[in-house]
Amino acid sequence: MVHRPRLLCLHGGGASSQIMRVQFSKLESALRKTFQLVFLEGPLDSAPGPGVLPFFEDFGPYSCWVSDDKSLLPEEKRKEENNAIAYIKTFMLQYGPFAGILGFSQGARATASILLEQQREAFTHDALFGVFFCGTFPPFIPDAPDISLPTVHILGLTDPYLRESEELLEHCTQQSVRRVIKFNGGHHMPTSSDVTQKIADVITMTYRTSQRKKVSNIWRKKVPDCRSLALES
């Protein structure tokens, strides 16, 4: 049996893995022959996020990766961010391998953080790439360097968070592969079948690029064998 590469999907703040599966249903169908999408639930309880109500009123409870509580002390905020990174890394090590990570809104911040962790000190053998949908900024790692792993950026031209999506794009070095798709829409997944197929094609292309990069760089890097469990599909 041929196993499809897995893509980890991280939902937006105040949403859920179930909501993201609905939002990504067209993209999941377009990618089904090549990839298996795995949807992870955020670690913290949350109020419904932007655009969640009223359509997803019956899809609670809602969760997030970090809270938007402005009363948190800096050390409390940093603890939340560290916990989110550790939570995602633990899941990836237990249920990997994963070929890439797809993040929507706050989930894009989480995705960027995991890519930066992999650059800083590789925690997995996987050749990761990231896909940012309507991404917000910044990552959960303060004063982080640019992301040098391959990335895809999906930007809504009327998204109120467009500037943050552009900041995230600027945070990815031009020396690496970074592909950009813009669509006429706001802070949501593109609904056009043509745009969805284009995104699927670019994700597949970026996956192949990341695999070639893995082969070319494999002699440079020593990665500890720390994966504890692989989940068979």
Curated annotation (Swiss-Prot):
Higher taxonomy: Eukaryota, Fungi, Dikarya, Ascomycota, Pezizomycotina
Function recorded in the entry: Esterase; part of the gene cluster that mediates the biosynthesis of the mycotoxin fusarin C. Within the cluster, FUS1, FUS2, FUS8 and FUS9 are sufficient for fusarin production. The other FUS cluster members are not essential for fusarin C biosynthesis.
The keyword Hydrolase is annotated on this UniProt entry: yes
UniProt keyword terms in alphabetical order: Hydrolase
InterPro entries to which the protein is assigned, alphabetical: AB_hydrolase_fold, FSH-like_dom, LovG
PANTHER family linked: ESTERASE DBAE-RELATED, ESTERASE OVCA2
Family designation: Belongs to the LovG family.
Name this protein carries in UniProt: Esterase FUS5
Single GO MF descriptor: hydrolase activity
Active site: 105 (charge relay system), 159 (charge relay system), 187 (charge relay system)
Knockout or disruption consequences: Does not alter fusarin C production.
GO CC terms in record: cytoplasm; nucleus
Enzyme Commission number(s) of this protein: 3.1.2.-
GO BP, sorted A to Z: secondary metabolite biosynthetic process
Description of what induces expression: Expressed under high amounts of nitrogen via regulation by GLN1. Moreover, components of the fungal-specific velvet complex VEL1, VEL2 and LAE1 act also as positive regulators of expression. Finally, expression is induced under acidic conditions in a PACC-independent manner.
Hydrolase found in the keyword field: yes
